[in-house]
Amino acid sequence: MKLTVCEFPDKRSRREAAWKELIQFLHAAPTDVVVLPEMPFSEWNIFTSETVDLNNWRRALADHQDMLPRFSELDARIVLSSRPVEETGKRLNQAFCWTRENGYQPVRSKYYLPDEPEGRETTWFARGDRHFTPITIAELSVGFQVCSELLFTDASHEIGRAGAHLIAAPRATGGHRRWRLAASLAAIMSGCFVASANRRSEDSKAFAGCRSVVSPEGEVLAETDLASPYVTVEIDLEDAMRAKRTYPRNLTI
């Protein structure tokens, strides 16, 4: 199975050009699965406000809704990411799966919400799902750990015990080494491949890009960088199944 991770610009003004570049990249080398960053079609700075600006919120909803029909422009079977939604009066950061056959499918909403100057997520979002149940898409089983959730290895372990092949980790973060370490530890604890996708800032260090695909043993298989914002690797789903039977995944709990 071919798996692609992407950097995506934070600036709204650069988004259309980046989308067209991604279309061209996948046209030249089609893939099975694309992982995009966390809420990729909104500028993140709106979520740093300590009060909710409803105009900005509605714009974020519209920006993501408008992009859903455009996923079919990508030479990919599956798109994994998250987006802002409003359901039953709650604002949520909803992980989702899009497939060429069945369109949009919600999976779960982000549970671990930071309250930091870089993101006042407890202000903007309600807590979502405490459990991390994977979704099955044809031959692929995938669980989501959205951004800060990747730091919680109990969630990784839960996803692995449920038999998943892949953890999708859409993110919006800086370049602290914790993120690379977290992706590797999530893979080791779950026996899953981990695909992490991040934003990149052009005029600051707020978002570092540099995202990766990690093997079930925690080895980095490929990483993006400024010159190569998209990277595709071939993975064998059976590697994830074999990893479940080995240390430390086979420990009794």
Which residues fall in each region the model found?
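CN hydrolase (nitrilase-like) catalytic-core segments centered on the catalytic cysteine
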Residues: 60-78, 150-230
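Active-site-proximal beta-strand elements of phosphoester/diester hydrolases
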Residues: 1-12, 35, 94, 107, ...
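Cys-nucleophile CN-hydrolase/nitrilase-fold catalytic domain and related Cys-dependent amidase chemistry
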Residues: 20-101, 176-189
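Short beta-strand scaffold segments in enzyme catalytic cores
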Residues: 82-83, 93-98, 133-135, 196, ...
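N-terminal phosphate-binding loop and adjacent alpha-helix
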Residues: 6-24
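Active-site catalytic loop in hydrolytic enzyme cores
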Residues: 87-162, 179, 242-252
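Short, flexible loop segments at the rims of nucleotide/cofactor-binding pockets, characterized by
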Residues: 9-14, 56-61, 120-124, 143-148, ...
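Hydrophobic residues at beta-strand termini and immediately following loops
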Residues: 6, 108, 135, 197, ...
